[in-house]
């Protein structure tokens, strides 16, 4: 039976780099929020153990694709049999992409989290969110927040999560044809890595910033130009390591008014924030139907 699952985009409302570990990973303080916008993932269970990605991404091999890696990681787990017993552990996976790749919206991590949650259900496993988050962390630091599906303040490498209440806001997200590698930004020698750690209450009361933004603006002139352009209408920041930027509004119409003015070669969308991610809502619906 074919099933379609949400794979939402996230924004980093702020992002501060507070240090670097001996293993190279960076210590962060960031606030994740979810948008009512994202990819759609269709999964068809197979009667064998093949994992087939029906919509490959250019320049990414099948075996290295995060979605395939997520499915195989779960496939390798002993599992917990549900009342239906042992089910086939294969799948055909298709992704309808709306979230730009290399944009800082968490598209790959979100896709991986959706696959872990969906296959956990479809294969009759019974792993908890906490157990899936541990698996997800092996795939990427952002995967756990998509597993839990709540707006959250993150510390550590992004894996220590504290749920946060976030008001309903509207966001204009803009981007060009630039794609940015997270690894490249975090390895840049000019990246600020010593922002003092602060309490969440202090961070929420202070102006929001992204420590990656100065480096990204310097290395990618198109991002710099876009941030300069939108500043005539509204404050804007980078999300993640870019290349997407965003502005916050109280109403949808305010955001759409600016979207209509964007220069040629600039793309974007308008979406509202949501306290619970669209993916988590999907699973709450599934659980209510089962019960």
UniProtKB/Swiss-Prot annotation:
Gene3D superfamilies: 3.30.230.10, GHMP kinase, C-terminal domain. Signal peptide: none annotated. ATP binds at residues 100-110. It catalyses: 4-CDP-2-C-methyl-D-erythritol + ATP = 4-CDP-2-C-methyl-D-erythritol 2-phosphate + ADP + H(+). GO terms for molecular function: 4-(cytidine 5'-diphospho)-2-C-methyl-D-erythritol kinase activity; ATP binding. Its EC number is 2.7.1.148. This is 4-diphosphocytidyl-2-C-methyl-D-erythritol kinase. The gene is ispE.
């Amino acid at each position: 039976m074919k099933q379609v699952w949400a794979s939402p985009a996230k924004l980093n409302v702020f992002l501060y780099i507070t240090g670097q570990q001996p293993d190279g990973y960076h210590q962060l303080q960031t606030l994740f929020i979810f948008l009512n916008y994202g990819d759609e993932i269709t999964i068809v269970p197979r009667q064998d153990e093949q994992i087939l990605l029906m919509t490959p991404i250019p320049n990414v091999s099948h075996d290295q694709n995060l979605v395939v890696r997520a499915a195989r990681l779960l496939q390798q787990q002993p599992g917990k049999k549900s009342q239906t017993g042992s089910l086939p552990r294969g799948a055909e996976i298709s992704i309808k992409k709306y979230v730009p790749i290399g944009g800082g919206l968490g598209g790959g991590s979100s896709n991986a989290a959706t696959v872990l949650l969906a296959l956990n259900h479809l294969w009759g496993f019974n792993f908890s969110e906490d157990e899936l988050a541990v698996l997800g962390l092996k795939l990427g630091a952002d995967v756990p927040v998509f597993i839990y599906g709540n707006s959250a303040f993150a510390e550590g490498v992004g894996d220590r999560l504290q749920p946060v209440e976030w008001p309903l806001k509207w966001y204009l997200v803009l981007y060009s044809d630039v794609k940015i590698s997270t690894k490249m930004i975090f390895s840049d020698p000019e990246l600020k890595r010593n922002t003092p750690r602060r309490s969440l209450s202090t961070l929420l009361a202070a102006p929001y910033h992204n420590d990656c933004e100065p480096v990204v603006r310097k290395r990618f002139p198109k991002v710099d130009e876009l941030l300069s352009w939108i500043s005539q209408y509204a404050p804007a920041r980078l999300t993640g390591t870019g290349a997407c930027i965003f502005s916050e509004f109280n109403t949808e119409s305010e955001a759409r008014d600016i979207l209509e003015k964007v220069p040629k070669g600039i793309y974007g969308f308008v979406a509202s924030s949501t306290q619970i991610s669209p993916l988590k809502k999907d699973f709450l619906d599934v659980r209510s139907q089962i019960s």
